[in-house]
Amino acid sequence: MGKHLVLIGGGHAHMVTLAMLHTFIEKGHRVTVIGPSDHHYYSGMGPGMLGKTYTPAEIRFKTRHVVEKQGGTFVCDKADNILAEEKTVLLASGETVSYDVISFNAGSYVPRLDLPEDAQDVYSVKPIERLMEAQARILELVARKKITIGILGGGPSSAEVAGNIWQLTRNVRGPAPAIKIFAGNRFMSRFPDNVSSKIQKVLTQRGIEINTDGYVQSVRSGMVTLASGKTQALDFIFLAMGVVPNPIFKNAGLATGPDGGLLVNEFLQSIDRPEMFGGGDCIYFQKQPLDKVGVYAVRQNPVLYHNLMAALEGEPLQSFDPGGDYLLIFNLGGGIGVLRKRWLLTEGKIAFVIKDYIDRKFMKKFQAIE
């Protein structure tokens, strides 16, 4: 008798499993995919969409269509809680879904700094759909007057968002906005000085200000307050601080890593629930901490597919090897990128062209199964 596989999220780590969904159905298993939207947006191309390099259609995958086309069930909802002992997921709608094997690719989110409910013109960089709303709102505001846009966060996300806002607004009628990054105590602190200085050079040459006078303590509509007590008036605020995993695992009492991600072994399997797997930003790999970059989710794809099938069929599991150093390219807007791979570091148009080629190839590969 077939079993029930449930996938939470249609992100990068589930792409191969989604493409091969029919193989589970052919073996007599049921598959249910639960996601907050009929589409999954590729976050690596999100800043480019903000800057209008890409259209929304170019960076999204038709999750519902792909699932239903292969005989699976798609539920547009969010997982709110996991009842691990009962092997049941409680959804935001109040519905419940039971499972035999479950896999999480639930992503991560940007903490909202205890924002008031009525805060206006404050947008987080995730989910990616928010970037579309932010794009329209920024264009609406800059058409009226000169505005100041603040980006909270000092990592790659803030750099890419700042560069692509510059691209979005540089040819609009009226005065260009002032763009300010509030980077805490140090900009791009996770990276070597030569990387951060190259990115900083590109941004500051465009008039983008990078503030390293301390962390933002609080956010209100139209204003941020730094830890020093200094305030800054802003017309539009982006939250681009470091992302954290979905809190669902900690809330369910499951074993988690220090960041709250589902703690998984070398098989991408929960260390205390053998029927539970995961990939991408929402897990914590027990053997070694992994950076929250899409390359690991892509590398996890085939292993996760194999192990989900193996768990359903009672076959041996396959180990995940994170691999060595990875290519990192930042899209800073204006057709300019910064590329880093081991000892190689370069900036300019060629870096962006390489990123654009890789990203479009990745999307076309999975959009082809639609």
Where are these regions (language model features)?
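Beta1-alpha1 glycine-rich phosphate/pyrophosphate-binding loop at the start
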Residues: M1-G72, E160-F191
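FAD-binding core/adjacent interface of flavoenzyme oxidoreductases
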Residues: M1-H4, K69-G150, F238
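Short hydrophobic core segments
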Residues: I8, S98-Y109, V216, A233-V243, ...
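A Rossmann-like FAD-binding core segment of flavoenzymes
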Residues: F74-D77, N81, T169-E266
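FAD-site-proximal beta/loop scaffold in flavoenzymes
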Residues: Q120-K145, T231-R299, H306-N307
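Rossmann-like NAD(P)H-binding beta-loop-alpha module
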Residues: A134-A176
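Internal hydrophobic alpha-helix adjacent to the cofactor/substrate pocket in enzyme cavities
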Residues: R170, V295-G323, I329
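C-terminal auxiliary extensions adjacent to catalytic cores
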Residues: G334-E370
